[in-house]
């Protein structure tokens, strides 16, 4: 099964033994886990309506987003990362909503709630436009599993494959 949720929810399921292996987006505390860092980095930007005043920009700076209603991820560690990117401008941010899955955020953008800060996706949202952040903000990912856990043969082989691949 593939299960989508925030890193915090997924780690909780791993601790309970419901999930064996997880792809976790950083920033994330992985002290309890063995992991392999994925080579691809994700780039942050804003998902905006095509008719937004921001839609004509090639990139967005903290000053461009100041005073605009913003939709951000609900994870505190991600919010802290974004606060660091915004710097002194963070105090001027208007946080309109938070999200746990990008599809929810895209629907909020579509309905005029604000611009969603998110990773660049291969998905096309028709009437929405992704605009990269400048200065560039990147996030990594790790494939993680509990230390010293006994896995099924299939899970063990998959972990070994991942270790050998990256």
Predicted regions and their residues:
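Secondary-structure junction motif
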Residues: 25, 62, 68-91, 151-159
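A local structural motif
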Residues: 1-2, 87-97
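Alpha-helical segments flanking ligand/cofactor-binding loops in enzyme cores
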Residues: 11-12, 63, 106-107, 156
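Central regulatory/effector-binding core of bacterial HTH transcription factors
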Residues: 1-29, 98-101
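Extended ligand-binding regions for polar small-molecule ligands
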Residues: 58, 63, 144-166
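Alpha-to-beta junction loops
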Residues: 14-23, 44, 91, 109-116
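Flexible hinge/capping segments at coil-to-helix
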Residues: 32-44, 48-70, 153-156
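Beta-alpha-beta core module
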Residues: 30-37, 41-43, 103-150
């Amino acid at each position: 099964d593939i299960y989508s949720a925030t890193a915090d929810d997924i780690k909780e399921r791993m601790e309970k033994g419901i999930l064996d292996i997880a792809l976790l987006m950083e920033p994330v505390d992985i002290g309890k886990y063995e992991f392999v860092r994925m080579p691809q980095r994700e780039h942050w930007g804003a998902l905006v309506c095509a008719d937004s005043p921001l839609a004509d920009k090639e990139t967005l700076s903290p000053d461009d987003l100041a005073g605009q209603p913003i939709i951000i991820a609900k994870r505190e560690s991600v919010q802290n990362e974004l606060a660091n990117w915004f710097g002194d401008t963070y105090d001027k941010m208007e946080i309109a909503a938070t999200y746990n899955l990008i599809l929810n955020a895209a629907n909020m953008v579509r309905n005029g709630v604000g611009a969603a800060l998110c990773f660049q996706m291969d998905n096309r949202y028709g009437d929405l436009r992704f605009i990269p952040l400048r200065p560039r903000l990147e996030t990594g990912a790790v494939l993680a599993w509990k230390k010293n856990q006994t896995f099924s043969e299939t899970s063990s082989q998959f972990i070994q494959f991942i270790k050998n691949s990256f």
